[in-house]
């Protein structure tokens, strides 16, 4: 296929931009265009079960409302995320305001690079977690805990998932403020967080899928939780990965999706695209453009 050159049009929308990237076809532009085509296939077919995996500071970086929209539009069937994104989604819903104060420490604020949140917001979160946990006892899966949290929030992707019945898995939840409060509560209450039950639930979801797709933002534990489950059925049929990590160190986060075929986590004939870049920038462009393409307003 001949490499084309980018042509600007004054009336170009995001869908048009992505189509132009696909027409160019080369290097990062081509990968972005192919990713849009794969995402379009995943989102336009009722036969594809779509997993969204999220590592890194997605909610602190402003993507929480986009995740909420994807859930409410029925574009994702399950979310696998780090505990930090769960915490920051709850903080936003509880009125904790993320502010951008530059790359510096500020008294009374916790910092994620140039984005800050007041430490008093975590006091509200602590009270919120006590209320949630006080109503739970015995063995509780992580997704059930996150659903209970979502039911008590007025907004955010946790609330959307609770409303729409979309499971949220967080296999590394103990490494977060949620995990800390679970541990504290379990010291003198009959409460056990059952992470194995989440694996049973995800395995059933994967086995029942006619086709399986994944949107992988970052990498780490959420990526592997999805790909490990996909191995139970011979691998993913579709996948788009956006990561800043590189493959030379052998890390999972930097591994291209083609590498997953050697582990049968991705099918040999799967349609995949790995984009190297900041997903906080790339994913909103990609998702918004494909939603335009599908007529979602």
From Swiss-Prot:
Pathway: Protein modification; eIF5A hypusination. This is Probable deoxyhypusine synthase. It catalyses: [eIF5A protein]-L-lysine + spermidine = [eIF5A protein]-deoxyhypusine + propane-1,3-diamine. Its cofactor is NAD(+). Keywords: Hypusine biosynthesis, NAD, Transferase. It comes from Methanopyrus kandleri (strain AV19 / DSM 6324 / JCM 9639 / NBRC 100938). One of its GO terms (molecular function) is deoxyhypusine synthase activity. Its EC number is 2.5.1.46. GO terms for cellular component: cytoplasm. The active site is at 265 (nucleophile). Belongs to the deoxyhypusine synthase family. Catalyzes the NAD-dependent oxidative cleavage of spermidine and the subsequent transfer of the butylamine moiety of spermidine to the epsilon-amino group of a specific lysine residue of the eIF-5A precursor protein to form the intermediate deoxyhypusine residue.
